[in-house]
Amino acid sequence: MRRRWKAAAGAIVLAFAAALGGLSPAVAQAEPPAAGKDFSKPAIVILGYGLNPDGTMRTILRRRVLTGLTVAQFFPQSPIIVTGGNPQNGNSEAGQMRKMLMLLGFPDNRIIVEDKANSTVQNARFSVPLAKQAGTSGIILVTSTTHQGRADGDFADAGGNLLATMSYPDGDPTVNVVQFARDAMSPFVNVG
């Protein structure tokens, strides 16, 4: 009896939706293909994250640095821009990221430090010109999944040529899966 009730209710909903045009086939719409992206020399921009009161890096920031370092292995000609001010105990986010990169063997001459930004908007506003001054072909942005959407928008608003996004998973697993798919597709299609 319960099954019949559910089937009948489902049929009524479908009939109602069809009558209103809710189930009519959608008109195919195609976006123009994404313009070819130039990965010849991308800037890898790692966004900061608040430091501990003693000036040390929080786990999320260390993970962002490791993600950026991994990306940099694929682009040996590219600089890494570390961006973040918000000093704690005499250390800026960018300064701590630079130290970690150097400890892990990344060459100092490929690190550009932007240590004035106190927000994601400022990260974008201050890093986009640095990427352009370094003669890069665009930006690969590195942050965390829960921060990615806002960061992408801020960098686009600042005039950044966003080639791809990479994010370290954090937060809600559903968001992580969706963000991973976006990250994987971003070099090939416009996502956003």
Predicted feature descriptions by range:
Residues A30-D183:
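A structural signal for short, hydrophobic/glycine-enriched beta-strand patches
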Residues K6-G10, G68, S186:
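General helical structural elements
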Residues F180-G192:
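Glycine-rich flexible loop motifs, especially short His-Gly-Gly/GGXG/HXGH segments used as catalytic or interaction
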Residues R2-W5, A131, N190-G192:
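Non-catalytic accessory segments flanking enzymatic or RNA/DNA-binding domains
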Residues M1-A30:
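Secretory targeting and sorting signals
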